[in-house]
């Protein structure tokens, strides 16, 4: 598969510049996990029985979508109608020529291009699979993407504004995500949970609920992958999955966490390093021990993660 030319010493993300096809080798693992998760979702019936309309937003080289078509089994890739989206004409021209020169080995799989804003692209048609991998925060794109989701589909969202999500840039975190995060050894996990909390709130506006499949902190970015289901009843249960994380909790906080089913009762006098609390617990938002609001449910699905393991 043809790749954009990079300097021999290139590692990780680089600054995007107009007229240059952007390719980040540090995201190779992310693209591999996307292929594996796509296969799992198809095999589990998450994407329906007909044509699967998939969108690779902010695509740059188009490599993620091309890997879907090249690496998934024929019975899966033949059902995929993939659209790659980018503002740069050069990127889309390069992706098209690469796809033509190195087509899928089985000769199936549809690849379309859309030059323009991702928000316009997602609203132009319904989608079963949407990948959002921006240079910075994904916050501006989530609402429009959620509106275009099918009744059952999968969305994957990356964020490289890790300074904000891990609490180092507190003002940016509050502006973009409406939360606070304690900067400690749990900050990256808290950041992923803040992402899931924000996304779940947006989903609920459109009578949808999310079910996390995989959450990853990998080098320079955080990434969450989740199923989106159209369900008013599940959307109404939103607040049951959002709450607070408290570092070095007091006895009464641990007791409340246990009573809410968020903490396993172990007995003894040793308190846990942290605990989760429901949204209605009266925390002091100025307390430096507190992170949130954030997702307090599971951040992944056992079956999805097992499908990515070597036997």
Locate predicted features.
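SAM-dependent transferase fold signal centered on methyltransferase-like domains
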Residues: 1-311
């Amino acid at each position: 598969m043809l790749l954009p030319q990079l300097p021999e010493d290139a590692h990780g993300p680089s600054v995007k510049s107009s007229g240059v096809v952007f390719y980040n080798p540090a995201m190779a693992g992310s693209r591999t996990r996307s292929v594996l998760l796509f296969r799992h979702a198809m095999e589990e019936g998450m994407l329906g029985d007909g044509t699967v309309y998939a969108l690779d937003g902010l695509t740059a080289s188009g490599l993620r979508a091309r890997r879907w078509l090249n690496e998934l089994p024929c019975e899966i890739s033949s059902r995929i109608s993939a659209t790659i989206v980018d503002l740069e004409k050069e990127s889309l021209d390069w992706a098209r020529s690469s796809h033509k020169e190195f087509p899928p080995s089985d000769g199936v799989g549809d690849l379309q291009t859309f030059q323009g804003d991702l928000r316009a692209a997602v609203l132009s048609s319904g989608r079963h699979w949407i990948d959002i991998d921006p240079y910075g925060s994904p916050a501006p794109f989530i609402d429009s993407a959620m509106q275009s989701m099918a009744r059952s589909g999968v969305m994957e969202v990356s964020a490289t504004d890790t300074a904000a999500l891990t609490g180092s840039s507190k003002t940016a975190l509050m502006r973009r995500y409406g939360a606070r995060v304690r900067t400690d050894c749990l900050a990256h996990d808290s950041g992923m949970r803040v992402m899931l909390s924000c996304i779940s709130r947006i989903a609920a506006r459109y009578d949808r609920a999310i079910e996390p499949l995989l959450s990853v902190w990998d080098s320079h970015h955080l990434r969450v992958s989740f199923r989106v289901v159209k369900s008013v009843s599940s959307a109404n249960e939103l607040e049951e999955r959002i709450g607070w994380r408290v570092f070095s909790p007091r006895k009464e906080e641990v007791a409340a966490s246990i009573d809410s089913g968020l903490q396993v009762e172990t007995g003894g006098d040793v308190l846990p390093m942290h605990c989760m609390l429901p949204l209605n617990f009266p925390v002091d938002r100025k307390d430096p021990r507190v992170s949130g609001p954030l997702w307090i449910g599971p951040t992944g699905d056992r079956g999805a993660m097992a499908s990515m393991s070597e036997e």
